[in-house]
Amino acid sequence: MIKQIKGMAVCLLLHSAAATAFSAQAGDLGTDAAVIERVISAGGSISEWLVAVGAEQQLVGVDTTSLHPQSLQALPSVGYQRQLAAEGVLTLQPQVLFGSDEMGPPPVLQQLRSAGVQIETLPVDANMLAVSQAVRRIGAVLARSEQAEQALSAFKQGIWQQQQKLALIDGAAPRVLLVFSVGHGNPLTAGTNTVGDWLIKQAGGENLAVHAGFKALSSESMLALNPQVIIVVDRHNQGLAALESILSHASALQYSDAVKNKRIVALDPTLLVGGLGPRLPEHIAQLMDAFYPQFPSVANKN
């Protein structure tokens, strides 16, 4: 476990250096930052980073996944990030639209570009390099580079603190499955290169889903993996209701160790949209508590 933590720390340093080089190049691009006053964000974590760098007053609209902080819910909605409507966006007269490669559809983005909207497609891969590049790009575009560095520093410090706590735990990594209810058919499971996979590993768990991205697995396939802990994610239900929704489409999971031992953890779905967000360190601590209940004080130790 200690070797794993040291490796993570080295990755943090390498990603920071590479992202700094990216930021230097990115700062020379785009609209004159001094005059940007109207911004739209599509992607929950992206919106949270805009708030973290002090740009909330520049936001004139957000997508439906942008629910944190709660104050964003008072802003006009431009719909779901994958299904933006040009008219709805242009009505808000934005100068810049921040999003990821999940943002679309492409014809709408082209229409927005033609109308003079600066489209900023940020990297949202689930790693420290991508989040560093994204936050620094936000800072460069909005003339908030100093605030971006401060927000990144706080985020990395939070991750480092959780890594130090994890290094104190002497125990086998629990077998974990993150299951995302889609309301119909087999639920999705979070595999590699997802925020869910990153969270599981940062909290000291073993992700049983080895496929790339999100993939639907049959009820029997998930039972064969026999997770010790199940993280449930549901846009419409919370807690036991979320588990019941998942079991209604994957009934075999009721025989898994996780369900039999009541080791079910609910996760806010907005954490999984738009890359790594600023709230993740606190959720790593919560998952660590759930993964290692025999060490109840470790995740919260100052």
PLM ranges: what are they?
Residues 8-20:
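Bacterial N-terminal signal peptides
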Residues 38-92, 96-103, 208, 238:
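A short, structured surface patch at a secondary-structure boundary
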Residues 38-50, 147-203, 272:
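Basic- and aromatic-lined ligand-binding clefts that recognize polyanionic substrates
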Residues 86-93, 218-229:
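Short helices/loops that flank or line small-molecule/ion binding pockets
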Residues 107, 123-137, 171-195, 239-241:
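Extracytoplasmic ligand-binding site segments that recognize negatively charged/polar headgroups
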Residues 63, 190-215, 234, 266:
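His/Asp/Glu-enriched short active-site or ligand-binding loop at hydrolase and phosphoryl-transfer sites
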Residues 37-38, 130-140, 149, 235-302:
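Structured C-terminal subdomain patch of bacterial secreted/periplasmic proteins
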Residues 103-114, 232-248:
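A ligand-binding cleft/hinge motif common to bilobed small-molecule-binding domains
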